[in-house]
Amino acid sequence: MHKFRQKYIGDKAFYKRYLMLAIPMIIQNAITNLVSFLDNIMVGQLGTEQMSGVAIVNQLIFVYNLAVFGAVSAASIFGAQYFGKGNHKGHMYSFRFKLYAALLVTAIAMTLFITNGTGFISLYLTDTAGNGATEVALAYGKEYLEIVMIGLIPFAVTQAYATNIKETGQTFVPMVASFAAVGSNAVLDFLLIFGIGPIPKLGVAGAAIATVMSRYIETIIVVLWAHKNRDKNRYLEGAYRGIGMPFGEFKTIFIKGLPLMLNELLWAAGMTTVTQCYSVRGLSVIAGLNIATTITNLFNIVFIQLGACISIVVGQYLGAGELEKAKDADNKMIVFSVFCCSVMAVVMLLVGGFFPQIYNTTDEIKSLATSFIAVSAIIMPFCAFTHSSYFTLRSGGKTLVTFLFDSVFTWVIVVPVAFVLAKYTALGIVAVYFLVQATELIKVVIGYFMVKSDVWLVQMV
């Protein structure tokens, strides 16, 4: 028992450092997801077709968001280690890489959405009821996408800045910027969706406009703070005096980061493909999944952000050459993450059924959403472990391994299971959803042996 405690349980100082880093990130994402939840409810009050149209577009934006995240994460592997080593110039080059990569991804995404947005939305619409509801949902989806695209550029810029700021251990400022953005989004949503006083009722278009405006607010706050506090953001020294970076630096980040960039993109595409497989069961399934996903995201933030903190803490230890400290911290953080998420899973099981009742939709959709939430709660502790394993492997630059562990697993195991069960069996959609989610157990076993092998204990800078 003493050995177990020594290996997997830290002291007060350890948890204080971990939580000081994690809590602002958890709060930031909690507020963001809470506002997304409120936004979802407000759009849901307009009708099932409006809610479904917006939900489908948000699936497409999800792929874009993860592609940007992958682009900046490629350089973040080096950024955390550069900062840990005190190499501010290297940190600056990693920032440039992030900015260029995020803007390139944005340009590609906007081109695809402009030229084939209708086709992408249509992939998720199957008219099983024969009442024309899918055509209405398509029209609302197109309206939402055309406006929300305007907010992609500020999102890309924010990610480049915010990730570099977090690598220096300053998680408070991105949190404040996020508060301002989501707060304004909530207020603007209410005013523009329903129309208050002289402001006209804009419905779905109002939700899109509110999202775009909040993106710009967040970007302005993050960028202005970073440039006004150069002493805390040394990577900005000379960041805009030139546009290039040493070929050696670029090559190293690109080669190490390419699997990670592809991983985020392919994983997100895989998840949306799974949703598309579910969508053949009808519009009610898409609506139920939308509600369940919105609620689940509120609870998932704990393991997502605790996992992200692993990459920062372990990355800094690795950059400083303290490999044993990195291994020790990793063991303790993984156990802590799984414990916290087990508690969250119990809470989610107990209260999850209340949330779908808030929506203005059919009893069938509410029932489906409640079942999907229960399944997600059961699987959550396993997701916490695999997520922690992913960030452990990533912190040591094992991007090819993370590529195989994450996106290849999704496309080789998860997508085929969802495709076959949804299209070629008579199983109910809840049973299909449970079996697809249960594939996470296979990933737990793989993650355990990968982390235990210590293949990630590498100093790269």
Protein language model regions, located:
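Transmembrane helical elements of multi-pass membrane transporters/channels
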Residues: M20-D39, I147, A181, S214-E218, ...
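Short runs within selected transmembrane alpha-helices of multi-pass transporters and secretion channels
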Residues: V72, S76, I147-K166, P174-N185, ...
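Generic alpha-helical transmembrane segments of integral inner-membrane proteins
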Residues: I26, A30, L34, L38, ...
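Helix-terminus/linker motif at the lipid-water interface of multi-pass membrane proteins
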Residues: A30, L34-S52, I121-E135, L191-L202, ...
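Short alpha-helical transmembrane segments in multi-pass integral membrane proteins
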Residues: M1-A22, G79-G151, I199-L258, V314-I379, ...
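Transmembrane alpha-helix boundary and packing residues in multipass membrane permease domains
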Residues: M25, N29, I41, N58, ...
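Small-residue-rich hydrophobic transmembrane alpha-helices
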Residues: M51-I114, F155-P174, I286-G352, C383-F405
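Small-residue hotspots at the loop-to-helix junctions and early N-terminal turns
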Residues: T48-Q59, G141, L145, A208, ...
